[in-house]
Amino acid sequence: MRPTVILTCAAAAHAQIFGNFFNQMLKKEFAVEESWHNQEYHKVSCDNGHVCPDTLTCVNSPLECPCQFPASEIKCVYPDKSGYVCISKPGDGYDGSDASSKAEDGKRDCAWVNKAFRGEL
């Protein structure tokens, strides 16, 4: 019985050391990316406008911000115009950006986003 307890404790200690090592590495990597993004954000010259946080694009208002990956995302503006969300385009080629279209079951498009916004899902 004692060897089982010793092996269990050793395995737990090893897992904790291993987990801590990678957790510290991830924290450092994220801090570097965040620091770089903040530096780039502050470099953007945008007089009398708004800098989009995801794309660092200068626009007149936050609702004009483009999606970060326009080839694979569609931008859906909330019904009350308080913001927007970029979602993956449906795989069938339909761009799904028409918020007035009828939301089809299982299809994630702007009509679906509007239903979710209103709490109808």
Curated annotation (Swiss-Prot):
Record's signal peptide: 1-15
UniProtKB keywords: Signal
InterPro entries: LCL2
Keyword Signal annotated: yes
PANTHER family (UniProt xref): LONG CHRONOLOGICAL LIFESPAN PROTEIN 2
Family named by the database record: Belongs to the LCL2 family.
Job description of the protein: Probable component of the endoplasmic reticulum-associated degradation (ERAD) pathway.
Name this protein carries in UniProt: Long chronological lifespan protein 2
Annotated source species: Yarrowia lipolytica (strain CLIB 122 / E 150) (Yeast)
Gene name per UniProt: LCL2
